[in-house]
Amino acid sequence: MKMYDLPDKRGHFGPYGGTFVAETLISALDELCKQYEYYRGDAEFQTEFFRELKHYVGRPSPIYHARRWSDHLGGAQILLKREDLNHTGAHKINNTVGQALLARRMGKSRIIAETGAGQHGVASATVAARYGMECVVYMGSEDVKRQATNVYRMKLLGATVIPVDSGSRTLKDALNEAMRDWVTNVGNTYYIIGTVAGPHPYPMMVRDFQAVIGNEARQQMQEEYGRQPDALIACVGGGSNAIGLFYPYIGEENVRMIGVEAAGKGIDTQKHAATLVTGRPGVLHGNRTYLIQDENGQIIETHSISAGLDYPGVGPEHAWLKDCGRAEYVAITDGEALAAFHALCRFEGIMPALESSHALAYAAKLAPTLRKDQLLLVNLSGRGDKDMATVAQQSGISL
């Protein structure tokens, strides 16, 4: 692949991305673009960002060889990039630290966020507490029920959690409400989008803050294995953990990049969230990307056992990587993800998030088809504490 320098100045990844928002937000986004372009090249900002990642988040996150599970499956060796070990338990904190530091430099006193699984909400509430800022988190009321523990964590951290009862009452609807808040309070408010979606510059900005995952992985693989992995595997909802791992590898065409979406009850049903596998291009939440929509262009309600993958869109960079053939996208069902969740618990003593379990499930399918000396690097994007009630319920156990 020739030198990769996307997005362009207007935020496009080929035909995807861009800025499709109300006129009232254009000046706020222009200002954000200007400020981010300045600070991404500012040595002092970058030094503070990486210092926070080291001393507050606990980076670098290690790469762990899941030896027992690999032996059990046969075939390729499965390696895990342990984002679950970060402060707050997932990759989301990488991005919220970066955006909160930017918000402070822009003179904002209030941050807002949307959240699905609650991890981005917790990470946003965490940095708000760290930097002494007001925090409001929008969350679909369906997700509030599914993720009661994370809701309480956000409140403990001082955030106000606002349940959203419109639409499917999930991440899509929370994002809509957060956008409305931002339009109204743009003077003192910074909107921390949690994934690589939304209007420009968010897909680029979130990618840049999450690229620490892939940059660390490249160095760690070279030091520990003397080479890079044969394939990268990461779950994809909006796609920030995946793009964080993939981005530094885009130019290495001998490394496969595999994004794993939620097939829910099956992609032949209406109960899934496999946007890139089944969707087609359209505009949602400020950018052009693949969407799950009906023949009239109306968004179809999605389903996944994991709240963080339950989204009808996807980051525009993933849409571009799919179209140009650099990345592959597959889908894993609720049942397959649950089986992988239990397997990692039993074989490695590691409890993965249900989102990450989708990536693990595909690794478990792929590994036996490959040689023993081949390496699969899976992004273990988060830990599974938040999913205890869901997993127990699936096993017929009431907590």
Curated annotation (Swiss-Prot):
Gene3D superfamilies: 3.40.50.1100
Any single GO CC term annotated in Swiss-Prot or TrEMBL for this entry: cytoplasm
GO function terms (MF aspect): tryptophan synthase activity
Pfam families according to UniProt: PALP
Top-level division of the source organism's lineage: Bacteria
Record keywords, A-Z: Amino-acid biosynthesis, Aromatic amino acid biosynthesis, Lyase, Pyridoxal phosphate, Tryptophan biosynthesis
Pathway: Amino-acid biosynthesis; L-tryptophan biosynthesis; L-tryptophan from chorismate: step 5/5
Quaternary organization: Tetramer of two alpha and two beta chains.
Protein name: Tryptophan synthase beta chain
